[in-house]
A protein has these predicted regions:
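A helix-boundary/kink motif common to multi-pass secondary transporters
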Residues: 2, 32-33, 56, 124-125, ...
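C-terminal ends and interior cores of transmembrane alpha-helices
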Residues: 42-55, 249-262
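Helix-boundary and loop/linker segments of multi-pass membrane transporters
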Residues: 156-157, 169-175, 206, 258-260, ...
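Primarily residues marking transmembrane-helix entry/exit sites
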Residues: 3, 57, 61, 164, ...
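Helix-loop junctions on the cytosolic side of multi-pass membrane transporters
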Residues: 125, 132-159, 348-357
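Short amphipathic helix-loop junctions that connect adjacent transmembrane helices
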Residues: 1-5, 197-211
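Substrate-agnostic recognition of the 12-TM MFS/MFS-like secondary transporter fold
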Residues: 9-26, 35, 40-43, 59, ...
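Juxtamembrane intracellular "pre-TM" segments in multi-pass secondary transporters
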Residues: 147-183
């Protein structure tokens, strides 16, 4: 597959998430966070089953769509459940720390499996996909074992459509602080997520053997896990605003470093994006949780994820085409300028809305 095909495939995943994201978050607020996560966990098992049997590009697209639906039903509900669980036990102030731990656990798992993935592929190309099935089943079993904190009854509204429209208006128009946090999360999220899909062709272009892709990926995600674990302490030392400004400055550092480097050692600049992801994720998740209405917490988090995914659906294929047309180095230079402007443009309204942070 060309890079355009790869980016198009990921755009299909993101498009499915876009279609399911806000409805799934709204449903989680109505029927319960755990119930939504059960749907997501079941979809993951089904998606990896389809992937393991895929024999055509179309079937792979179908698998990505099923996985995308699963991601949508998990997104928002998992973090909302974490928030209400901590609040119920009097530990709401520790959310950033636990959010970082949750992200670190996921990234550590990805680091370990990435290191083994290439080796498993050499044994049998479909083996990594088959092994995803019991892993997804274990995740589903973990969700089944969860217990949800009972919540007060939601404020009655005339219809679900009216309630959903109320959430959209509140988050995107009425609540300036929430809107600013969402915009910054999208700008920083897309800036770093694009490199997740460009780093392998970048390494190939710098002469790094494919056998090293897994170890490099694993090392990067191990670093991301460490940053996520340290995010609460970093925020405590420097404050929210200074830490997020640092995240914005990591965007040009990462893109410029990768673009200008001509040797394999340039891959070290990829850690700028891992650092960005490890810091901004827990910080902005907490900000959005604090500003979200209690009855619509998962809806707000899902809306933020929807905006991020929609941005990638729009930007992904053109970025892949840009790399195919002008080459990796020139494309990275262009992306560095565009994403730096976007990140700083989103950071300024955030500082005005959250001046005390």
């Amino acid at each position: 597959m060309s890079l355009t095909d790869v980016m198009t495939l990921q755009a299909a995943f993101s498009l499915t998430v876009v279609l399911c994201e806000f409805p799934s978050g709204y449903l989680a607020d109505r029927i319960g966070y755990r119930a939504s996560m059960l749907v997501g966990g079941g979809s993951w098992v089904a998606g990896w089953l389809v992937y393991a049997w895929a024999a055509s590009f179309g079937t792979v697209v179908l698998a990505e769509m099923i996985l995308g639906a699963g991601a949508a039903f998990m997104s928002g509900a998992d973090r909302a459940l974490l928030w209400v669980s901590l609040e119920a036990t009097g530990r709401g102030g520790q959310y950033t720390r636990w959010e970082g731990r949750m992200r670190a656990a996921g990234q550590t798992s990805e680091a370990v499996t990435s290191a083994a993935g290439g080796w498993l592929y050499t044994i049998k190309p479909r083996l990594p996909f088959w092994l995803q099935i019991p892993a997804a089943a274990l995740g589903l079993a973990s969700i089944i074992a969860l217990r949800e904190i009972p919540r007060p009854a939601a404020t009655p509204h005339r219809s679900h459509l009216e309630r959903a429209w109320h959430v959209l208006r509140f988050a995107l128009w009425r609540q300036r602080r929430l809107r600013a946090a969402m915009a910054l999360a999208v700008a920083l999220g897309v800036s770093s997520f694009v490199m997740v899909w460009l780093i392998q062709p970048y390494m190939r272009g710098r002469g790094i053997p494919p056998s090293w892709f897994g170890p490099v990926w694993a090392a990067a995600h191990a670093w991301l896990a460490l940053v996520s674990l340290a995010s609460a302490r970093i925020v405590g030392a420097f404050g929210v605003r200074a830490t997020l400004l640092g995240c914005c400055l990591l965007v040009p550092l990462g893109y410029a470093g990768l673009s200008a480097s001509t040797s394999a050692a340039g891959v070290v600049f990829y850690l700028a994006f891992m650092t960005l992801r490890g810091l901004q994720g827990p910080i902005l998740a907490r900000v959005m949780q604090e500003e979200a209405p209690p009855d619509d917490r998962a809806s707000v988090l899902s809306l933020a994820a929807l905006l991020f995914r929609l941005s990638f659906v729009i930007a992904g294929p053109p970025i892949g085409a840009l790399v195919d047309r002008v080459g990796m180095d020139a494309a990275l230079a262009v992306l560095g300028v565009v994403f730096t402007i976007a990140s700083l443009a989103a950071f300024l309204p955030f500082t005005r809305a959250h001046g005390h942070a």
